[in-house]
């Protein structure tokens, strides 16, 4: 066996997805729009010439618009920070040469930003697949360890297709020579 055949590495994308860029931009712009209308209703002066804020009373409509504007803007900034930090990005590495499985992810900034888990391959009991269809589909591959610990291996947010999940899970189970559950 060559070194390439002795290890498998799957990259896991983080928060830098197209949808997050769109949502972050919309939340920031929408929040600023609401906040501007709320402030202009308080000042009784049109800050934006496109909207007549004189029709909006400050109490209660302008105050509520200020509240939603601040909330929307802060949520947009939070999404942009997730994109900046690339939260959740990492890899899953299965190495038969060293005899270890390594699961790495980037977390929130701070002392524990690097989430780096390493387990001996002998600890792996099986690979489990969970597939739920519906409005919010759930397609996750779990690494099942001794002691009933389960570690998710797939990314959150945009689920992979059923074919991709099944192929990846079968490839992992065959490579690690463990059973495959849930398919």
UniProtKB/Swiss-Prot annotation:
Cellular component, GO annotation: chloroplast thylakoid membrane; photosystem I
- Biological-process GO terms, alphabetical: photosynthesis
Q: Extract the InterPro entries matched here.
A: PSI_Ycf4_assembly (IPR003359)
Q: What is its main location?
A: plastid
Membrane topology qualifier? Multi-pass membrane protein
The listed locations are: Plastid, Chloroplast thylakoid membrane
Look up keyword DNA damage and say if it applies: no
What Pfam families does the annotation carry? Answer: Ycf4
Judging by the UniProt lineage, the source's domain of life is Eukaryota
Q: Give the keywords, sorted.
A: Chloroplast, Membrane, Photosynthesis, Plastid, Thylakoid, Transmembrane, Transmembrane helix
Q: Which residues cross the membrane?
A: 21-43, 63-85
Give the protein family: Belongs to the Ycf4 family.
Protein's job: Seems to be required for the assembly of the photosystem I complex.
**What HAMAP family does this protein's entry cite?**
Ycf4
Name of the protein in question: Photosystem I assembly protein Ycf4
């Amino acid at each position: 066996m060559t070194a390439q055949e002795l290890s498998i590495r799957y990259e896991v994308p983080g928060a830098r997805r197209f949808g997050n860029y769109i949502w972050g931009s919309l939340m920031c712009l929408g929040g600023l729009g609401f906040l501007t209308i709320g402030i202009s209703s308080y000042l009784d002066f049109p800050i934006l010439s496109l909207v007549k804020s004189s029709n909006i009373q400050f109490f209660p409509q302008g105050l509520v618009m200020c509240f939603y504007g601040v909330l929307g803007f802060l949520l947009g900034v939070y999404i942009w920070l997730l994109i900046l930090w690339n939260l959740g990005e990492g890899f899953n590495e299965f190495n038969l040469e060293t005899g270890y499985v390594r699961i790495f992810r980037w977390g929130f900034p701070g002392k524990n930003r690097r989430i780096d888990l390493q387990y001996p391959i002998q600890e792996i009991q099986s690979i489990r697949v969970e597939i739920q269809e519906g409005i919010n589909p759930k397609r996750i591959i779990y690494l099942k360890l001794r002691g009933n610990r389960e570690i998710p291996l797939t990314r959150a947010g945009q689920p992979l297709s059923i074919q991709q999940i099944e192929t990846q899970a079968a490839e992992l189970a065959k490579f690690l020579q463990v059973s495959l559950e849930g398919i």
